[in-house]
UniProtKB/Swiss-Prot annotation:
UniProt xrefs under InterPro entries: Coa3, Coa3_cc
Designated gene of the protein: COA3
Mitochondrial intermembrane side: 72-106
Region (Disordered): 84-106
Keywords (A to Z) from UniProt: Membrane, Mitochondrion, Mitochondrion inner membrane, Transmembrane, Transmembrane helix
Protein known as: Cytochrome c oxidase assembly factor 3, mitochondrial
Source species: Yarrowia lipolytica (strain CLIB 122 / E 150) (Yeast)
Location (main, coarse): mitochondrion
Length: 106
């Protein structure tokens, strides 16, 4: 049975327990604190997973490169000739020409 935290006075009692200090940078058990290199135990523990991780990395890299390559291959033949371009007023063309000619001089 759980206790109701309401104390009958319209307020709640808050029981604060002392919190240990927040340690942002904890000492690693398997890393040398002076050189920040992995210990031999950590290297031995990671060794069985190395080949599997590298194969997964190669697979994901190949998959992403394949998608990118297929996208570039598919889009290289698209000329966007069917997209209508709205006509511009001669005043707007002069404005744009003066704007971009000023930018190129600067």
């Amino acid at each position: 049975m759980s206790q109701d935290p309401h104390n009958g006075k319209g307020t709640f009692e808050v029981h604060k327990q002392p919190q240990p200090g927040l340690k942002v940078f904890r000492k690693g058990k398997y890393i040398d604190p002076k050189t920040f290199q992995m210990s031999p135990a950590l290297i031995r523990a990671r060794r069985p997973f190395f080949v599997r991780n590298m194969l997964a990395l190669a697979g994901l890299t190949g998959f992403v490169a394949g998608i990118y390559g297929y996208t570039m291959y598919s889009l290289r033949t698209d000329d966007f000739g069917d997209v209508p371009i709205p006509p511009l007023d001669p005043e707007e063309i002069k404005k744009l020409q003066s704007k971009y000619s000023d930018d190129s001089k600067a």
